[in-house]
Amino acid sequence: GLGDVYKRQHYYPAPVLVMQPTLEMGQTFSKDFLAPMIRDTPVLRVLVDTKSRYSGNTILKKNFPGGHVTIIGANSPASLASRPIKVLLCDEVDRYPASAGTEGDPLLLAQKRQTTFWDKKTVIVSTPTIKGSSRIETEFQETTREEWNVPCPKCGHYQPLRWANIVFDRHDLKKGVRHKCERCGRES
């Protein structure tokens, strides 16, 4: 999500489209997450001029050299038209309408905007809702279902990070957070 937006603004500038279920949720996303990330990250603060009225930046669009981040609502067919994008971030897809007006599936409409780019990237995330009719569940079932694995610094065993293996003292967080290896049992 936001990490990819950061990477695209800083290292690999490109047109980015963030699609929220509604335009109102998009505005909230921009105000509560995107704007603070830009404000609090010095390198992004330099790239995205949020102060000048001539920069073209608004709550729903942030311009930077080589690209932009545009935030839209899945319920608005007009915002899905005529917009080539390289990176598509679809948030809370279980809350998307079945159709953007009479235009069709908002996810498919947004993905059509990526045809210009051979190296496009699509990120689809959501909190699952109703089992059996959850869009994110369907998307997950259609993937390879791979998990990111990290090596244990002690024995080298590769394993996914699981919450059950995170070790910390909730009464003294200054002691730090560690990960317990599922094979050797040592913490690092």
Predicted ranges, named:
Residues 1-188:
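Phosphate/NTP-binding elements of NTP-utilizing enzymes
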